[in-house]
């Protein structure tokens, strides 16, 4: 039995210290900073919905007028509300509060959704039979203590909802409830950030199970129906139009996916857009192959979903540091899988556990560099764009996870997309493999 409780306690201590520091930083946010946070766009969109302007919710001039009133006496340009219509309906109750109080309540709510996602992933993951609770606690704290959580809290952003949807999907897929898992994934992605499901949807399609497709379609129909009920068809058209307009409002180098990396290298323009599109398609294809590998060998679920989660961040054109909290459930099941591997290894080492922790630490350091300001930025010679440091780390992790996923399925004797094993007519129900081209 492999335990290594000292390492787990060290992880707990460091993670707890970081979380306390995050709380202190968040508590010190000034009213001016709150008015300039991403939450103001949610507040504006939800206020328009609450006041009966659902069909005009994506009118840029109407948003700008209300935004100026909300942040007065400060004067900054409008940050457009471009989240899905359901987001405005969910956030509407907090707009009964003043902006500052609503910001605090909403930040806590999003943090709680992230904590719920992590706890659900911990409870659903496959841990060693004799694993101590200390490792589950350490994993949960480390998942929440990544720098993306601080960024999400500071901006009162939505990505905790996406993480909860991913955790629910993982729980049901682990239990064989494939259709219900797909429903959760699509429903929660459709609340505010549907673009944070690109690689995950490709993974689900690669799995090629009728129940998953039916669940995804059912979830999409539900999201579409509720969205139309909230803003009408005209509001949906306005949503699409405003999203297209706002895509050029932000510097590409600020994003953490391939769009950010290409923005750092080529800047904005058609060549960069074409190169990003090719990279996004490649990331989704790799996620699809990971789904095909899991279809052939269900034990590859954790590492295959890791590929899909990373591919999602890399493929989307609009992902900031706070969107990296989508990877928190991924870290949990990766740690659980590492504990299983270490427990089964000769001599019961902790090599896999240390490797996963090192990867998570590396990503956190990249996040820190991209968020660096003040004295740290001076030491580094100026702020570092997120697109200059984070995408490379994500690409490296995705390549390693993809190799492990595809090699794992080949070791089982089945290539991704090959026919599934069939049962013989023998009483012992021995499984035989049907290779392509065999008679």
Residue ranges and their predicted role:
Residues 335-439:
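Aromatic-enriched
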Residues 98, 193-196, 330:
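Hydrophobic transmembrane alpha-helices
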Residues 1-181, 204-324, 328, 337-339, ...:
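Primarily membrane-embedded glycan-assembly and transfer machineries that use lipid-linked glycans
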Residues 185-187, 216-222, 305-310, 350-362:
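Central hydrophobic cores of alpha-helical transmembrane segments
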